[in-house]
């Protein structure tokens, strides 16, 4: 997703010395990044799912579902496997050891842009596994919280494979959280253009959607399909804070209807955690345009 340009208004009259600020690379910094999510389980499913969908878009497989295996008593791991472009060794190291770096900031055809979503499993687990399938070679890695609290990438080796290109992310889940992962998967993936194939929980099911009324870019559904108004941008559903709109405005009246609004990638500003919208003029105008 292309970042929206911002103009910094700075007065420099009388400046005699200027020094750039920096960020210290230590456990505190990485812990703050990992703990920015109010709902870590939902964030993990959302970010890894968005990355899987982006990989399918790059591979021209946007109509092919990726796979999600939910944790259960037989296999307590969450496994998310895409069948997209795969990753070379150079790409793996570039993506997983660099925070704030993304190769998606020049396009609005893909969701990512902040360079932190691929590391979201560290918000829940102390390590997670990365298995890449690339042109007949399978390579296994793990991103772990090292003894000093700074994440490090470990590589375990490569083997020949006949598996399709793509990436699998996996990590162990506590038994008490099995149902939470299943519930959050419904919340997150019901909004995806191409929903993933979900296994591991026999009771998992997407809710049936029955639209009462709809327009080109919005719909209002019957029942509790959406408990509040959301804007879907790049497969990710963002709750809309109606208090950001004038009380007697037509937007405020419409947004009270628990609607689902769809906008193109880049039409709104979002927070780095991707849990909420950033209510800039750009975002307000984008929502108003979508429901006008």
Feature names for model-found ranges:
Residues 1-63, 90-97:
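Bergerat-fold GHKL ATPase/HATPase_c domain
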Residues 107-216:
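GHKL-type ATPase core
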Residues 152-156, 179-291:
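GHKL/Histidine-kinase-like ATPase module
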